[in-house]
Amino acid sequence: PVLLIMGANWCEDCRALDAALNSGKSAELLAREFKVVKVDVGNFDHNLDIDAAYGHPIAKGIPAAVVLSPDNQVIYATRAGELADARRMSETGIYEFFERV
């Protein structure tokens, strides 16, 4: 599956999630299970067509995530800002989140 991570470089939670996903067991999980694609949404003014195409996962905050099947169907998408407080999530919590999706 493809994992879209929608975020922005100004976003502290996006930077925290990125760091967590690039180290330890989370990095191993993502490398094994997903093709990861980062989507820059700027100040909620970039790539909004991608956000719209997958049901507006950024509506409740960023970072947001969408998991797509090989035929581009949404398997999972954040809808309630599940990752919008990523800086307060433990590395284990982030790993478990992506392990569930």
Q: Model-found features: residue ranges?
A:
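Non-catalytic, surface beta->alpha helical segment in thiol-disulfide oxidoreductase systems
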Residues: 59-101
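Hydrophobic heptad-repeat coiled-coil signature
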Residues: 11-17
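Solvent-exposed, acidic/flexible segments
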Residues: 4, 14, 23, 43-44, ...
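Loop/turn elements at helix/coil->beta-strand transitions in domains of secreted/extracellular proteins
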Residues: 1-3, 32-37, 62-63, 70-72
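Structural alpha/beta surface segment adjacent to cysteine/selenocysteine redox centers
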Residues: 45-62, 71
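Thiol-based oxidoreductase modules, predominantly thioredoxin-like and allied folds used
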Residues: 6, 19, 23-48
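Solvent-exposed coil/turn segments that connect beta secondary-structure elements
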Residues: 9, 41-42, 70-71
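Short active-site neighborhood of thiol/selenol oxidoreductases, capturing the structured segment around
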Residues: 1-11
